[in-house]
């Protein structure tokens, strides 16, 4: 018997599919972004309440990146005190001809802040412990892709969590051809007693190994490469959550709140070019 349905369809169609799945008595696990409008979010929440099923989201830049998993362990273990600010950078390589057409149609992919920005806001909430946030500023632009007028090739946003933590992130489609991987993803986590830097996919001009973790605290300066050493505990936890009806992998509230804030950031964004 099928108990969990996984999907990565067109972004704007993910909510409708999820509602059908939940009404059929199954849990749903979907690629980010899990929806593109607040109306879809309202329908998702209503269906969750009616069915008791799960609508889980694959925020892969934390859940499937070992350095990000390790950073979570450092934060939870008190290595840098309380997380008070997160700054993220999520550059990507576009290579538009290799991508499906819907990925550059705004109504379908939701815009850059809704799409790849979802990774960043989810990590902000996770590392700071905030359960909600206010978008204080957001911007989008299309700098060099006039042939794709609905594409945002740049976006950034600032936010303040309901616990006082602050966040900033930048996402873009400007990875240069000379980089050895699809994007030089970075994350900076400031705590009250130290800070962490993640060089997720490459350590530029030093090593092509992914999952580089740097941190500084009262005990000194630290570095570890965790590629192949940490694993991805989320997936096993999710399976157990579906079986036992628990919320150890990720709470439903967190999964939806991260995406809600991304949609709001996109809606509020000032177009700079």
Regions found by a protein language model. Name each.
Residues 58-66, 95-133, 149-153, 254-255:
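Mid-domain beta-loop-alpha active-site segment that forms a flexible
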Residues 35-96:
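A contiguous active-site-proximal alpha/beta segment in oxidoreductase catalytic domains
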Residues 4-7, 54, 162, 237-273:
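C-terminal helix-rich "cap/oligomerization" subdomain common to oxidoreductases
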Residues 223-236:
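Active-site loop of classical SDR/Rossmann-like NAD(P)-dependent oxidoreductases
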Residues 24-26, 50-54, 165:
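A short helix->loop->beta-strand "cap" motif at the edges of active sites that frequently abuts
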Residues 122-204, 234-244:
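Contiguous beta-strand/loop segments that form the cofactor/metal-binding neighborhood of enzyme cores
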Residues 187, 204-219:
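Short polybasic amphipathic segments
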Residues 1-47:
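Beta-loop-alpha module in the N-terminal Rossmann-like domain of NAD(P)-dependent dehydrogenases
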